[in-house]
């Protein structure tokens, strides 16, 4: 087992930092006054970009690591070792893993990757309200509850999803997951959280058996208890549940495509193998970015088209859900590293983060073409559609 894995396994301890209390806004938001925006987490530059969904103009960005040096200085020796090892595994600094806006559009919640914490910011005042360290050494994907009171984040090396009170930053509960939990999503009705795990990505493909459980975990959002689990044959990468509540689409580690999975039957019912680009053909599986051939999956608003992001292929494939047939491809320059897909609020566009190009590509589901490309910060990854209070936009840089 790699030295990094041994140290991390031995050093996983409870390291949650008590956060200062901050009262949550109790006033109901004036939803009609809020503005539809796309949040883009710029992982290396430690900022979140705001893109206007009406016209795709950049509205600016917000610095979410104003306390970077302080946070590093606060680390004890074990935490600092974990930070450096995780930084190596991630391929460098990764300060923004995920982000969400509060229902009133005035607070920004951020999962801060290699800092292994979650922070809340008052946008208007440009003030950090609290930060809370998670168990383990890396804060991963996150999801905000529909009512805005809970922010659930994957504590990657601790193999748990931790639920945070957004008013105070306190960790109120956690749920066990598979090995190296990754994505979190609330169900459409808000009753459940679905967490998926990817396994230890530092191990080579030949040791896939040692990567741990590749598990989809269904958690009751009210009790924060696990109600059901499913095991898949490979690490579960970007995924989504169709409106029928049973059809699960997922990209898997090493698969140049995705699978369709029946949750009720507990089995894969279809596998879509996508074409390799010329550059991708030269890569060995152990050279895929953290085991991912494809890393980004979204569904059009009408449910007719999947946006399958070909990370090693430098393209996006638009795939019909009826028959799982490729309908169109949008190709990017070699080395663009498309790394996430997110459907627009109106359901008509797929936003694709181009991590190495420092931009977001806007793809029209209906025409199968790129209609805009928006410059953002350094190494964009996660994108989230949100609503912001226009009054706070003046705080953006």
Roles of regions detected by a PLM:
Residues 1-24:
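Secretory targeting and sorting signals
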């Amino acid at each position: 087992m790699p030295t990094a894995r041994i140290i991390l396994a031995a050093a996983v301890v409870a390291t949650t930092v008590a956060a200062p209390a901050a009262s949550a806004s109790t006033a109901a938001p004036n939803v009609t006054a809020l503005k539809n925006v796309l949040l883009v987490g710029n992982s290396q530059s430690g900022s979140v970009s705001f893109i206007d969904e009406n016209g795709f103009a950049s509205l600016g960005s917000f610095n979410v690591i104003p306390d970077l040096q302080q946070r590093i200085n606060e680390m004890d020796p074990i935490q600092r070792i974990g930070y450096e090892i995780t930084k190596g595994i991630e391929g460098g600094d990764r300060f923004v893993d995920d982000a969400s806006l509060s229902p009133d559009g005035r607070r920004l919640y951020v999962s801060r990757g290699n800092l292994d914490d979650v922070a809340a910011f008052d946008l208007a005042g440009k003030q950090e309200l609290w930060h809370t360290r998670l168990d383990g050494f890396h804060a991963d994907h996150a999801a905000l509850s529909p009512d805005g009171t809970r922010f659930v984040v994957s504590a990657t090396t601790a193999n748990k999803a931790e639920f945070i009170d957004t008013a105070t930053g306190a960790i109120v509960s956690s749920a066990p997951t598979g090995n190296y939990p990754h994505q979190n999503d609330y169900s459409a009705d808000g009753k459940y959280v679905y967490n998926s795990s990817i396994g230890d990505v530092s191990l080579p493909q030949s040791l896939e058996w040692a990567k741990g459980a590749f598990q989809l975990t269904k958690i009751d959002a009210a009790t924060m208890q696990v109600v059901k689990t499913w095991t898949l044959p490979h690490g579960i990468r970007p995924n989504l549940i169709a409106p029928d509540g049973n059809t699960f689409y997922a990209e898997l580690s090493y698969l140049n495509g995705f699978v369709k999975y029946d949750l009720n039957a507990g089995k894969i019912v279809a596998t879509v193998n996508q074409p390799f680009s010329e550059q991708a053909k030269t890569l060995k599986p152990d050279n895929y970015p953290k085991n991912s051939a494809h890393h980004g999956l979204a569904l059009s608003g009408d449910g007719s088209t999947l946006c399958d992001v070909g990370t090693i292929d430098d393209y996006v494939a638009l795939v019909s859900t009826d028959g799982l047939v490729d309908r169109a491809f949008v190709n990017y320059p070699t080395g663009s590293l498309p790394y996430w897909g997110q459907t627009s609020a109106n359901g008509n566009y797929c936003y694709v983060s181009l991590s190495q190009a420092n931009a977001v590509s806007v793809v029209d589901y209906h025409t199968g073409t790129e209609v805009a490309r928006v410059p953002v910060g350094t190494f964009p990854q996660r994108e989230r559609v949100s609503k912001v209070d226009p009054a706070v936009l003046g705080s953006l840089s």
